[in-house]
């Protein structure tokens, strides 16, 4: 992924109008970071620490933020006390609350808390998210359908305990019982989505070899196939730090073993697999984006062994069959519901 021609997002452009907020400050930055504006923040601040939850932007920016501390993390645990926290507002309210709970203990009393985001992400009502941290909350700018909220940290802050944020739910599909754990910021937080459920109900009875769970989320697919087929070797990948942490928790909760690591589609994958499984992501932050799913399909044959199989679930309106027919044989629809379809195919060689 290259950001060479990547323009600043609207939230970043609004921040550009207010850069005096960051001048000579010791800043902690997190949330929906999706452009190169961190480079400007680094230049403005006295010191800067960035907590990325999206592996794509972490991978591109980690070596450019040469004077900053840079983390890809679901749970920041540094020792520094900052005088400003900037959160690029995520789409999910629970993720914002989680970030505030995790990061405010690392602030000095009286520090600034700044939320920036678009109206469609809920910035207009985000002052309620800050109420337990401050009684001095102001909207200091609004433009490009975005706003900046500023709060002074003047309320007591509790120590952060990640376990309080984990939602665990039971799962029973085809007489296979599981406990799934998920953190805020993960797709279908705290419940099984209907697409993944349809995929699990229609996987083959026999599986062997090495399996990849692409876009693993909370690890539902991997946990299911490992419980059904303990002999499998399973890798789980995602770009989301909260998803990867959740997948590890789900594996542990079910006494299962899998290899969990970040990868932007196949960027960090060197193996070839017998089976690729996925409920492919089609959101990037707050926007609909099919790039990752299409890249996964287009490059999947490079990571499958001879006669390797791919099984995915997708919204019915998406024409993934057209992409699959280019590289696979025996492309078929295994099952359909009113919203989803399960597709499977085999490599041509």
UniProtKB/Swiss-Prot annotation:
Domain of life of the native organism: Bacteria
InterPro entries (alphabetical): DNA_methylase_N6_adenine_CS, Mtase_sm_N, rRNA_ssu_MeTfrase_C, RsmC/RlmG, SAM-dependent_MTases_sf, Small_mtfrase_dom
Top-level enzyme category: transferase
Compartments where located: Cytoplasm
Coiled coil start-end: none
Catalytic activity: guanosine(1207) in 16S rRNA + S-adenosyl-L-methionine = N(2)-methylguanosine(1207) in 16S rRNA + S-adenosyl-L-homocysteine + H(+)
Protein family per UniProt: Belongs to the methyltransferase superfamily. RsmC family.
Function: Specifically methylates the guanine in position 1207 of 16S rRNA in the 30S particle.
Assembly description: Monomer.
PANTHER family for the chain: RIBOSOMAL RNA SMALL SUBUNIT METHYLTRANSFERASE C
Stated name of the protein: Ribosomal RNA small subunit methyltransferase C
Species of the source: Psychromonas ingrahamii (strain DSM 17664 / CCUG 51855 / 37)
């Amino acid at each position: 992924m290259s950001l060479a021609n990547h323009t600043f997002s609207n939230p970043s452009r609004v921040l550009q109008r207010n850069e005096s907020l960051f001048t000579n400050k010791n800043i902690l930055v997190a949330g929906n970071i999706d452009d190169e504006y961190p480079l400007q923040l680094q230049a403005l601040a006295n010191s800067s620490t960035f907590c990325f939850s999206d592996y794509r932007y972490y991978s591109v920016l980690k070596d450019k933020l040469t004077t900053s501390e840079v983390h890809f993390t679901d749970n920041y645990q540094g020792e520094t006390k900052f005088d400003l926290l900037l959160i690029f507002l995520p789409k999910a309210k629970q993720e914002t609350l989680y970030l505030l709970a995790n990061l405010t203990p690392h602030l000095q009393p009286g520090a600034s808390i700044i939320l920036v985001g678009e109206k469609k992400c809920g910035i207009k009502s985000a002052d309620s998210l800050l109420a337990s941290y401050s009684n001095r909350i102001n909207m200091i700018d609004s433009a490009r359908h975005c706003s900046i909220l500023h709060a002074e940290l003047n309320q007591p802050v509790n120590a952060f305990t990640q376990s309080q944020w984990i939602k665990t739910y039971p799962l029973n599909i085809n007489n296979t019982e599981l406990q799934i754990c998920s953190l805020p910021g993960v797709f279908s937080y705290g419940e099984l989505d209907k697409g993944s459920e349809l995929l699990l109900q229609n996987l083959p009875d026999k599986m062997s070899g090495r399996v990849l769970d692409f876009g693993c989320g909370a690890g539902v697919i991997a946990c299911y196939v490992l419980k059904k087929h303990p002999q499998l070797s399973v890798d789980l990948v995602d770009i989301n730090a909260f998803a990867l942490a959740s997948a590890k928790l789900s594996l542990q909760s079910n006494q299962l073993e899998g290899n969990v690591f970040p990868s932007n589609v196949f960027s960090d994958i060197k193996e070839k697999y017998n089976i690729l499984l996925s409920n492919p992501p089609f959101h990037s932050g707050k926007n609909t984006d099919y790039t990752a799913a299409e890249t996964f399909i287009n490059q999947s044959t490079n990571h499958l062994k001879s006669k390797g199989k791919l099984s995915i679930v997708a919204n019915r309106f998406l024409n993934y069959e057209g992409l699959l027919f280019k590289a696979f044989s025996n492309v078929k629809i295994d099952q359909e519901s009113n919203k989803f379809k399960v597709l499977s195919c085999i490599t041509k060689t």
